[in-house]
Amino acid sequence: MELPSLIRSLTLIDDRRNNKNKRYPLPLLLLIAFCASISKHDSWYTMQDYALAHEASIRELYKQLFGEELEHVTPSHDTLNRALQVIPHKVFKEAYQNWIANLLQWDEQTRQICIDGKTMRGVKKLSPDTESHIVSAYDPHLQLVLSMDAVPVKGNELDAIRRLLDELDVTDALITIDAIGCQHDVAEQVLEAGGDYVLQVKGNQPTLLQELEDSFPNISKGYTVNKEEGLEHGRIEHRQMKSVVLSPEMLDDSYAFKDWAGIKSIHRITRKRYDKRQGKETTEMSYYISSIEDSKRIFRAIRDHWKIENQLHYMLDVYLGEDGWSKRAGGGGHKHGAHGQNRSFHPTASKSKARQVDSTSADVLSQTQSSATLRTGAIVRIMRQPWCVCPFKRTCKRK
């Protein structure tokens, strides 16, 4: 199957500039911004340097993609700034949605959406009221960000979770959320949308947590156990999950479980970690409720939920330096943060950034066919980055 070109999708963006002084076409500016950004150039100045360093390659690539040979392909940092900052970030998001909509194929047996938040610390330091906390919906199997929402502080994360569930197509998906999402209305919202849930239970639901802590020691039969062992970062970790499918008796008025919509099973995970260096062993327990009974799927889903930290948040911090981003013109920090996950647009105009040029994006985009579509290998390398944004329910169709 021929895959659509990401770069061609960007040409759907309207050029909002005045008809005068259009020396550089908008697709060229977008192409330079995209190539430079995935090579970790996050200022207008380093983008200008990137275009100068790869002038011949950019000219040839533009000709392959758009069938036009340009005389000038090295815009100044001011030109890039003025042309791209006036475009709303939602327009960029829609361009990615149009591109990825044709690529997705859901597996209804394993489909999972992890929801979690991350604070952009550089933005928060400038203003406590800035929308610095980004809540993301992430597919750990496709390794794609499905959507995101920005809120001022972590305390508002629950509102963002509700909005994400409302705009995403969660049909047949297993939604995993940490304790902040363990709310009655969240569970109901997931079920009404055609999905299922696995919610972690902590102190924000004291009655439910106490019920779980009291129930498991008294359960001597009718339960299943899933185990796993691993060695990571010098620690040996044993994970064991004890699962119980709720009987009709456990859903009567004498138990707190009856108040949770669609609840079918409860789970306790015991994690024992042995630090080889320090010679210390620690044990912790965590509790979960779910609207499905398949304990093996739940055990794997809880484990995969951590991929939003390991694959997305870690990538944003370590490789893309998200915590160093600050408030910017043309929409503020949350606007840039939302596109830190597609990492292509609205970079800072700070001169303090070192001007470094590399050829990462040139290597990726050199795999371009004459038909102006990216090769499968290049598409996979691009779509598996945390800056990709996936379609909302109105455009995301399972195939």
Segments predicted by a language model, with ranges:
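Short, flexible loop/turn motifs enriched in small residues
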Residues: 125-133, 281-283
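Short, conserved catalytic/metal-binding motifs centered on acidic residues
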Residues: 32, 47, 76, 113-118, ...
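Active-site beta-loop-alpha junctions of metal-dependent nucleic acid enzymes
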Residues: 149-167
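Short amphipathic alpha-helical "interface-anchor" segments enriched in bulky aromatics
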Residues: 292-327
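Dynamic "connector" segments at or just before major functional cores
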Residues: 1-114, 123, 127, 136-148, ...
